[in-house]
Every structure is written in structure tokens, then in C-alpha cells.
Amino acid sequence: MPHAPARSGDAMSAAAPPCCTSLLGLSLSMFVAPCALAATPLEGAVVSAPAPTPPTPDLAYPELFQAVQRGELFDDQKHFVDFLPLRDPALINADYLAQHEHAGFDLRKFVDANFEESPPVQTDAIRQDTALREHIDALWPKLVRSQTNVPAHSSLLALPHPYVVPGGRFREVYYWDSYFTMLGLVKSGETTLSRQMLDNFAYLIDTYGHIPNGNRTYYLSRSQPPLFSYMVELQAGVEGEAVYQRYLPQLQKEYAYWMQGGDDLQPGQAARHVVRLADGSVLNRYWDERDTPRPEAWLHDTRTAAEAHDRPAADVYRDLRAGAESGWDYTSRWLADGKTLSTIRTTAIVPIDLNSLLYHLERTLAQACAHTGTACSQDYAALAQQRKQAIDAHLWNAAGYYADYDWQTRTLSNQVTAAALYPLFAGLASDDHAKRTATSVRARLLRPGGLATTALKTGQQWDEPNGWAPLQWVAVDGLRRYGEDGLARTIGERFLTQVQALFAREHKLVEKYGLDADAAGGGGGEYALQDGFGWTNGVTLMLLNLYPSQGATQAPAKTKRKPEPAAP
């Protein structure tokens, strides 16, 4: 029998379908939001209509934007899109057009005169003789931001409550990062802040119809891996089962977002996030509303599209954006040839991790509906069962692991990746599939420093040799649900050893880790290695709680300590 989740037990139209109507056999628009409850404003939330969202930087001052990004004024393309225009962007752009061809025009001076720079998140002012656990506890206040109001023309979106940012170049909240950060907040006793994070995401769902990639205007066209149901489950473990009913309206809207557009699909067709396979099964993919270069990686995307000689640039841009929505930006999973970014085809892939998370969302909706005393619980449970059957039919490789499915070529991937453990994390795997997946993962992905992301070295950051904290936790938690405690412990302890070794040497936690014996930070990708780091902090605390004998609570050796910066 499949395991149920083991822990606690396009916006949607305001008019919900009749309560308790059976969902099976009805159109997607009928079942994405059954029995919708009137949304009750969350305590302390901003309930007035938000100000009109400013256009993204590439649309607000297009000629200036392209000149800055093409001219590579800044090492990181995200840097400029986070700058604050000091006056109306249209006027700034007009002045640029009037001046830029004049002799002696200095683009950098023009930018400095018209924009305010956003500094990176600093986390290096903590005493350097603290142990790892105490260091993480001291990091939380440095990563907290409160932006209930933002200046006019900012790309930042206001949120009603404080929130935790990852660190470094990531000065805003991120959707899927935040679940792993919240695990650590709860473990640190910061349950109020964890609840505030959850309320912020509920606010984003109510305001924009979905949780965007992050709270920036240029992230609104997509989401990220749907972990809102896990956040609700986490908070229910703190406050009790009533949490499920409190967030039921937002859970339903979240589901509506991911299922929107599937009403009229015929077998072999897709719309937005929804794919109807040849046998009529409905599963999901990653998607983005826009098919233009990402503002935060504009030059990178235009160069990638230029290398794809046989494809329209818009298709490449959409797939790059969908890859960003996946959180795995980027990986061989999305590449047609397994190595070249310009062959990216994310929207052709039905990912095992996304569909596992949506199964958990359906199960959580069933649980939340049960608290209302309606039959909708049975309906969502039936939808979850349908998804499980489709996953077993299309995303299970007979070689012994879960994998991604290409719905356009009707082929199943033969690559073992860390995503194969998401069905265990979501509780949808059978005992046999869980055991065989564990065997495959041990043989293909176990490294000296933990769980590898994939077994391919491509230069992309979500491939060999990098290890990522969220994937370590998905693995450890998922394996433990199915009694694979030995492999879970091996992965968890090896990753803790990597975290501790780098911490002892450099007194910081980073976004990703190399998994070789030298315990270095990870590489690859579009930007330099970032420290802070939200999800690493959260997962490290969870692993320390599970495996305290690993000795990762020691303070860095004094001989390894960096000198304190000189006083100004």
C-alpha cells in the first residue's frame, strides 16, 4: 500500500463550483477549487488592494536596460535589476535616449546618478568562535527583512510580515528555499517568524493568484516548486490541526494555479503547467508566462538563444524561464543532448519532483477539507490517487528508479537523479519502488560528501559534483519514511561533514557544496558562490537534530579563524 505523507497527519475565480460535487470526470476548472471557502483575512495581513505592480525593469526602461546589461557594467546581471530608480523610469529612459550618443557620455555615471544600488546581504559580522548551531541561530536576525512598503518604481514586492532571505545576491524571499529555511526556524524556536513566512505566502497567493519565484516584479510570471502544502503541514505541527482549515482557501488557489489551462486538452497536448498524456492521464510541467530573456540574466539568455540555430529564440527563452521555475537552474535533466544549455527543453519534460509535490498538495487538500466536514476530502484524495497511478505508469523506470518523462517524444529518462527521491518524500511510493529507488541512488549518487544531484558533469550547477541542502533533506526525510534509515544516515552524516569542514575553515555556510573529499563550496552556474545561506542553515539544523553524534556542533578551530576586520 502507498504511504500517506508521514508528518502531521491566472488567479482562481471568486465563484467556486458547488460544494461536495464529485470531481471525477469533470473539467479541470471544476476540480481545481471545489468547496472553496470564503477567504478570511489572515491576522495582521495587508488586506487592501495592492498598488499597481510596476513593470519589470526590461519594460520600464528598455533601451537603458539593454545597454547596461549588454555592456556588462556589473559582473552579476541581477545586480542592476535590483537597483532602485530615483525617479520615473520613463523619464530616466528618455534622458538616456537623448544623451547616450553625445560625446563623452558615461553610462556608468548616468546609472549612478539615476539609481540607488542595493547592497548584498552581509552575514560576516558574527563572532568567529561560535559553534555551528549557535552560528546559525545568530544568522537568522541578519537574514530577516521587513518590507511592508517599498519605494515607488522598485522591483521589490511589499509583504505584510517579516521574512528571511537566503543571503548574498538574494535580497528577496524565494518560494521553495523558504520551506527548508522554515524547518530551521522552527528548530531554532522561531515559530512566530515561521508563521509570518507562511502568512506572507498566503498573501501572495491571495494577491497575485500564485506564489511567485520571489517577491520581485520580474519573478511574477512564474512560480517555483510548490511547497506551500509542506509549509502548512510544518506549521500544523507547531500550532495544531486547525492550521489546515485556516489555509484551505490558499491551498485551493495554489492548486488552481498549477492546474489552470487544462480544460480542453486532448491527449498529447499541453497548456501552461498542465499536460494530458497520450492515454489521457493528466500530469504537470514547469512553465513561465513570458518568452523573453530573464531580466536578471538577460545577457546570459540572449547568448544561449543565439547558440540555438534551429529554434525560435522565444522557445529557448520560455524553456530557460521554466528551468528557473523548477529551481534546478540549470541541469542536464532539461537538456536535449544532456550537456548543452542551448538544447534546453524544460517545457517538454514531465518532472518527477513537481508531480510528487502536487500529489502532496492534493493529499493536503484532502486533509484540510476533512476539517470542514465536506465530501471534498474524498474528491481530492481521488485526484491524488489518479496522479499516483499516472506517475507509476509513466515516471517509473523498470531499471529501478523514478525518472522524468518527455511527453513530446514519449520517452522516459534513463538518468538517475536526486529527484528520484521525491516520491518517497511525498509518501506516494510503494514499498517495493522505495526500496529499489534507494538501491539505485546508493549505487549512482552516493558521494563522500552526501547525495549528488545527478551523475553527469556538465558545468551546470544542478549536476555533478554539486550537492544541495534541500536535496539532502528530501533524501533523508524520504528514505526514513520508508525504513531506509541506514542510507538516510549515511547521506545526512556525510553532508554534515562537508558543512562542518567548510565552516571550520571559512566560518560560513554556503548555497551549495562540492561533494568531493576536499569539502569545498560548489561551482558552476550563472553567478559566484553565495553564503548565508537560508536553506543550508535550515537543513543543517534538522540534520544536527537527527545525527548529533556527528560532531558538527564544534566551533571552528582557532587556527582556522579569519582575522576580524579592522575598525573603520
Swiss-Prot record:
Task: Give the location in the cell.
Answer: Periplasm
Q: Give the annotated active site.
A: D329 (proton donor/acceptor), E511 (proton donor/acceptor)
Q: Which SUPFAM superfamilies match?
A: Six-hairpin glycosidases (SSF48208)
Relate the protein's function as given in its record.
Answer: Provides the cells with the ability to utilize trehalose at high osmolarity by splitting it into glucose molecules that can subsequently be taken up by the phosphotransferase-mediated uptake system.
Task: Tell me which species this is from.
Answer: Xanthomonas campestris pv. campestris (strain ATCC 33913 / DSM 3586 / NCPPB 528 / LMG 568 / P 25)
Protein name as it appears in the record? Periplasmic trehalase
Q: What is its main location?
A: periplasm
InterPro entries given in the database record: 6-hairpin_glycosidase_sf (IPR008928), 6hp_glycosidase-like_sf (IPR012341), Glyco_hydro_37 (IPR001661), Glyco_hydro_37_CS (IPR018232), Trehalase_periplasmic (IPR023720)
State if Signal is listed as a keyword. yes
Keyword set, alphabetical order: Glycosidase, Hydrolase, Periplasm, Signal
**For this UniProt entry, which residues form the secretion signal?**
1-38
Gene that specifies this protein: treA
Is Hydrolase one of the keywords? yes
The cross-references to Pfam families, in alphabetical order and at most eight, read:
Trehalase
